[in-house]
Amino acid sequence: MMNTTFAPPFWLKNPHIQTILPKFLVKDTLDYERHLYKDSLDESDVAFDYLLADDVLVDGKYQKPLVVLFHGMEGSSQSHYARTLAKQVQTAGFHFVVPHFRSCGGVAVSGKIFYNAGDTAELHHYLGILKQQYQTIYAMGVSLGGNALAKYMGEYGTDAICECAVVVSAPVDLASASIAMDRLLGKKIYTPYLLNPIIKKALDNQITADEITALKRAKCMGDFDNIFTAPRHGFVSKNDYYRQASALPYLKEIVKPTLIITAKDDPFLGVTAERGDVSSQVVLLTTEHGGHIGFIDYDYATRAFCMDYIPKRALAFFEGCV
């Protein structure tokens, strides 16, 4: 287990401050170049937002590495973690892209299928599109996208298209994460923030009168997953979905270098991976603090918040994989 210290000042150690504050700190706006592609089902358009580096094409492919970010639930290229990572990737001289899951990034779905935490076929499809254009691909996934990427790395093994992966704040055991989210603060603060937008999108989609009634009564993510996510994506119940979509059982099968970063105080997570749960190609980096995709520090010399802990760990890991 890697021990790379993350030690914020005492007044930043609260997990809820770590989780909520980044949304208000990141002010940079980035000029992404957007391309639309069809999803793996050839039903819906999905948006890929690129930041390109100066590069040359050799045999039709860019030679500098591409860093791919798989966003979290209801995330996008405008999420604070995407913009923070993008700046570091630009500084390193690499290409950057955020492929959005179906219905995210402002592009509505055309079919009945949205996205879920275990849809590795969709990730493989996205990476396949990118492999046609880029010689070297590194991938990072956060939260829901982190679980999907970790599962992908184990499920696809040597066929995984990216050279290596970094997984951050991932609910690799979805059932226990669902329980964690239903605790008092999670239910009062985080659940409405995540649940309300996705319910609104679902209500705008092709749904029955019974589904509409049930969705309007949903009070937690478990309700939504039982009513909508599970049946829409071929699972018989939320428990079936959580069991099949969780990355934890697949971590032993990972054969390409993978770094999993988790804060012990993450309010979104339940059971997390331990050394005996993963293959020899997986590095576990566990910090005492950091919240959920937070990891905010403070530089007293410059009197500024620092949000580069995760991007720096990720880029160092990618460069070490070469």
Segments (PLM) and residue ranges:
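Alpha/beta-hydrolase-fold enzymes
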Residues: 133, 138-233
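Catalytic active-site module of serine/aspartate enzymes centered on a nucleophile-bearing elbow/loop
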Residues: 290-322
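Short beta-strand/loop motif that positions the catalytic acidic residue
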Residues: 254, 260-262
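Active-site nucleophile elbow and catalytic-triad environment of alpha/beta-hydrolase enzymes
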Residues: 227-250
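Short beta-strand element of the alpha/beta-hydrolase
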Residues: 63-72
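Short amphipathic alpha-helix adjacent to the substrate-entry channel of hydrolases
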Residues: 80-98
